[in-house]
């Protein structure tokens, strides 16, 4: 299964239901339009600064946005490197 990017959540759970464009959101949270567009299009992750702004605007927490990003990053890393890491790293034996 493909990792869900926070931009997909932003678009499908927030922007679409509100009938809001990425450009309108960028103006509302005072960031460049490219930042929001890149997040919505899965080209950029959510930073702490953006998480604070989104949380303030939508009335949720910055942790909500950062947790989405961390979960996405971890799933992506697992898909990319899990087999290699299993080959390279042995579990520590119990004492």
Give the positions of each predicted feature.
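A short, Lys/Arg-rich alpha-helix, primarily the initiator
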Residues: 1-20, 64-67
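Short, charged recognition helix plus adjacent turn
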Residues: 11, 64-95
């Amino acid at each position: 299964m493909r990792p869900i990017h926070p931009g997909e959540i932003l678009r499908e759970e927030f922007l679409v239901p509100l009938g809001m464009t990425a450009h309108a959101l960028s103006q509302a949270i005072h960031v460049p339009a490219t930042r929001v567009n890149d997040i919505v299009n899965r080209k950029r992750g959510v930073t702490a600064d953006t998480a604070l702004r989104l949380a303030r605007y939508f009335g949720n927490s910055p942790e909500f946005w950062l947790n989405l990003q961390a979960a996405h990053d971890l799933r992506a890393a697992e898909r990319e490197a899990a087999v290699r890491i299993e080959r390279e790293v042995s579990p520590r034996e119990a004492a």
